[in-house]
A protein has these predicted regions:
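A short beta-loop-alpha structural element at the N-terminal edge
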Residues: 2-14
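Conserved GNAT-fold acetyl-CoA-binding loop/helix
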Residues: 15-40
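A short helix-loop-beta-strand connector motif used in the catalytic cores of GNAT acetyltransferases and
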Residues: 41-53
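Conserved beta-hairpin
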Residues: 50-62
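Conserved acetyl-CoA-binding loop-helix of GNAT-fold acetyltransferases
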Residues: 91-104, 131
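Conserved active-site alpha-helix within GNAT-family acetyltransferase domains
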Residues: 96, 108, 120-139
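Conserved GNAT acetyl-CoA-binding A-motif
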Residues: 107-117
Length: 148
């Protein structure tokens, strides 16, 4: 098992895993980003996301994708957009290795914390996050506006 920074050549596999996650989260039709846009956003002249991958026997079996979020109260924070391990590779410690590496990256970059969302019905993920002394906020409501 190897945890390493994502490479441009990993993007196609990462997109496969994103689609797998969308199926698990009961939203397969919600993934509308193209591979080209995904690649440009992470590896173009002005990257807006970074990622680490979990590789087993030369195959990417999971990844964590993040970007920098700014809080007027807390300063720069890591926003964890996705952390996932393919179903076939779960239970082998890859998620823990990814999360531990994110903690290292956050400390190295002097981020004031890591924030993310989890679906309220995703008990396996919630239980996983609890071992990191995660605070779960039931007060804030998610808002979004689509620009289609």
């Amino acid at each position: 098992m190897t945890i390493r920074p994502a490479l441009l050549t990993d993007c196609e596999r990462m997109m496969q895993l994103i689609k797998e996650l969308a199926v698990y989260e009961k939203a397969p039709d919600q993934v509308t980003v193209t591979l080209d846009h995904f690649v440009t956003s992470g590896f173009g002249s002005n990257p807006v996301w970074w990622a680490i991958v979990a590789e087993v026997n030369g195959v990417v079996q999971g990844f964590a994708l993040y970007y920098i979020r700014y809080s007027t109260w807390k300063g720069q924070r890591m926003y964890l957009e996705d952390i996932l391990v393919t179903e076939a590779a779960r239970g082998k410690g890859l998620g823990t290795l990814l999360m531990d590496e994110l903690m290292v990256i956050a400390k190295q970059n002097k981020f004031t914390g890591i924030v993310w969302q989890v679906l309220e019905w995703n008990e396996p993920a919630i239980n996983f996050y609890k071992k990191y002394r995660t605070k779960f906020d039931a007060e804030w409501i998610n808002c979004s506006v689509e620009m289609n």
